[in-house]
Structures are given as C-alpha cells and as structure tokens.
Amino acid sequence: MSNKNVNVRKSQEITFCLLAGILMFMAMVVAGRAEAGVALGATRVIYPAGQKQVQLAVTNNDENSTYLIQSWVENADGVKDGRFIVTPPLFAMKGKKENTLRILDATNNQLPQDRESLFWMNVKAIPSMDKSKLTENTLQLAIISRIKLYYRPAKLALPPDQAAEKLRFRRSANSLTLINPTPYYLTVTELNAGTRVLENALVPPMGESAVKLPSDAGSNITYRTINDYGALTPKMTGVME
C-alpha cells in the first residue's frame, strides 16, 4: 500500500473519530439540558372516557433559563390530531416555575369503546436566546418530550392491573409473538426467553406484536410490564404455545 493511501486512510479515521466525539458530546449536552431544564410530571397520560379534562404538570428546573413551551397531541401514527386539545398550546415559562397543561376530549365518543386507543402527547421546550450572545456562534436545541396518551373507555371487562398476566406467547421461526387478549395496551419490558434478553414491545389491545427470537432461546418466558404510573410490575412468567 502506498504512503498516499495510508495517509488518506489515517485522515478518514481521524475525521470519523472527531465526528463520533462531537456527536457524543452533543448527546451529553442534550441529555444534561433535558434533565436540568423542562420536565413532565408523568411518563404517560391516562384519559378516562367521560372526563372533561386531564392535567399534566410541566416544570422548568433551570433557574436561569426561560423556555417557550409548545404542546400538541398526535395519533398512533405520529400525525397531529385534533381529537384532543391541549391548553395553553403555547406559553413562555421562566426558571423554577411549574405550569399545568389541560388536555381536553374532543373525540365526541367516536373512539372504540371496547378497548384503549393510543395517542402521543408532545411537549416542545424551545430555549430563549440570550441577547448578549446574538453576535456569537451559538447552538440552540429544542427538546421534545413525547409520552403515550391512552384513551380508556369506561366499564372495560378487566381491571387494568390484571391485564399483564393475561399475555400469551407463540414461537414461529425466528420470532416470538406476544398475544394480548385484553382491552389495554401492554408495554412489555425485561422480556427474556431462557437466558436470552429480547426486545421491549408495545402490544395493542386484542392484538399482537412480534420480536426477534434467537435460535437458541429457551421456552421459559419472564417479563415485566409498565403500569399506569410508569412503574414496573412484578416479574411474571409465561410459556410459549
């Protein structure tokens, strides 16, 4: 190999390392700003049918920063959806302050009444620009917090805290199908087949979801789910059908 090719290769490796370092640094900065800045009061929103509104707390933990807060709801496909209205949709939030978002039901009872429906609650925090730094090269990052919003009909056949234990499993080729016979969405985590750790899964009500399954995975299943409060349920066991 010529010296020219060696130099080109070394230059490419250095460039790659620099880019990787920059991306890692930016990720750390974003994570730090997200933790120190705007936070939501819940990891998911449950909207009981028939209720006029539900509330979601928003807190600015950064004493020295003001954020513009923009909020909206999307459907399960990630498309903005007017069936739920967030108010106020846009407001400024000073440091060390808390505000409350009100989510209003505008579905007119058009959603299924025998199972939950999934939406996404979005809260974007846009940092204000420091006027003293307008002449400098600065990077302003808007952080979007996105959490699940479940519309829950009244009088479902099964209490929500009993849904996780009803989950069933079926093996087919190189995948494991999770079967949910309940009217609730199930967020499955810490899913194991024998000693193999599998992917997390969101299983729709009265539906199923598949995850990759290694060929040497065992038939004994253990898993946990996330409850209405964002906490993990106790570990459960299941057997492949």
Curated annotation (Swiss-Prot):
Superkingdom per UniProt: Bacteria
Keywords annotated in UniProt: Chaperone, Fimbrium biogenesis, Immunoglobulin domain, Periplasm, Signal
GO cellular component terms, semicolon-separated: outer membrane-bounded periplasmic space
Signal peptide feature range: 1-36
Cystine crosslinks: none
Gene Ontology BP term (one): chaperone-mediated protein folding
Annotated localization: Periplasm
Function in brief: Required for the biogenesis of type 1 fimbriae. Binds and interact with FimH.
Family of this protein: Belongs to the periplasmic pilus chaperone family.
Name under which the protein is recorded: Chaperone protein FimC
Organism (species): Escherichia coli O6:H1 (strain CFT073 / ATCC 700928 / UPEC)
